[in-house]
Amino acid sequence: MSANTYMQQYKKATVEASGPEETLILLINEAVRSAEASRLEQDAEKRGQLLDKARRIIAELSSSLNMDYGGEVAFNLLRLYIFINRRLADAMGGETDGLTDALRILRHVQETWHRAVEIARESAAAQG
């Protein structure tokens, strides 16, 4: 088996063994990584693939929001995800400001999710 195949199997096993919080963190990290990598990519086709990957991840995060349970927080996240996807689409069209905007918001969302999961773990540990 190639190193790439092993890596794909490792990633799949990691996601399958993760809880929803860890899966969310893995996804948002990968969206940020793909968007950042697209900035450095010289090949237009590969850059487009990286941006498309980030867009698909954000679309998946959007579709997983529970609007009934999440209320205003879920609605605001949906609005952020829509904005990020729009700006990534603009970046696919060659607009460099689109990628800058998308990455700025993506990093903020990433940081917020990391902190939220950390707080939830601390709270769970304190309760027993």
Where are the regions that the model predicts?
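N-terminal intrinsically disordered, cationic/polar leader segments
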Residues: 1-37, 46-53, 59-66, 72, ...
